[in-house]
């Protein structure tokens, strides 16, 4: 140290990154934010956020295990849910505010069609789908017991998402990160 000053700019927004070896579970890269020393908070392992559409493949995987195929047709059309007890109406939409009608599951997944994901979850049942998705290593208590689960409204850490996704990359086997 020469007694000089050092400057650093603390970013206003922070992020996290997790990279796992899907075959072994080895953590290849982990970034939990700008500075753990400043915040004592690791966003990669502690920050629970909604994964959004990156969660849909888990719902589709459950559908494939429940008799659907990549070629199965599912209706991408408007749907309305009425909660009589709360006197609320839910009209889910696709991000484009368009509907494509009957669409093959493979196309619906790569186009991230919300209504198809919701219909798949509805047809399989929320509780049985949660039981299936928990096999990827997710805590059932973090998975909402309603149809919004199909849109990725669970609260999960980046580590949990990366761990779940690793099963897709290694033939369906769950790993434990280390």
PLM segments and residue spans:
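Beta-lactamase-like hydrolase cores
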Residues: 2-21, 106-109, 121-122
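A short, well-structured edge-of-sheet supersecondary motif
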Residues: 9-37, 136, 178
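Structural recognition of the beta-strand scaffold that forms the well-ordered cores
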Residues: 18-19, 28-30, 72-75, 107, ...
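Conserved catalytic neighborhood of penicillin-recognizing serine enzymes
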Residues: 23, 68-129, 170, 174
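Active-site SXXK
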Residues: 24-25, 48-76, 108, 164-168
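A short, polar/charged loop-to-alpha-helix boundary motif
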Residues: 37-47
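Extracytoplasmic/secreted proteins, especially bacterial periplasmic and envelope-associated proteins
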Residues: 50, 58, 62, 69, ...
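Active-site-proximal helix/loop microenvironment
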Residues: 135-178
């Amino acid at each position: 140290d020469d007694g000089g000053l050092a400057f650093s700019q603390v970013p206003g927004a922070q992020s996290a990154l997790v990279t796992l070896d899907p075959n072994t579970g080895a953590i290849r890269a982990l970034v939990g934010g700008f500075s753990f020393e400043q915040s004592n908070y690791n966003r990669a392992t502690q920050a629970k956020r909604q994964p959004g559409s990156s969660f849909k493949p888990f719902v589709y995987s459950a559908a494939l295990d429940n008799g659907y195929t990549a070629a199965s047709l599912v209706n991408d059309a408007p749907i309305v849910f009425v909660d009589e007890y709360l006197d609320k109406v839910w009209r889910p939409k696709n991000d484009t505010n368009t509907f494509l009608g009957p669409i093959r599951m493979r196309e619906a997944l790569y186009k991230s069609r919300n209504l198809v994901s919701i219909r798949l979850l509805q047809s399989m049942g929320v509780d049985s789908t949660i039981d299936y998705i928990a096999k990827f290593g997710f805590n059932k208590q973090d998975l909402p017991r309603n149809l919004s689960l199909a849109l990725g409204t669970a609260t999960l850490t980046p580590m949990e998402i990366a761990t779940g996704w690793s099963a897709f990359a290694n033939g369906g086997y769950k790993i434990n990160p280390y």
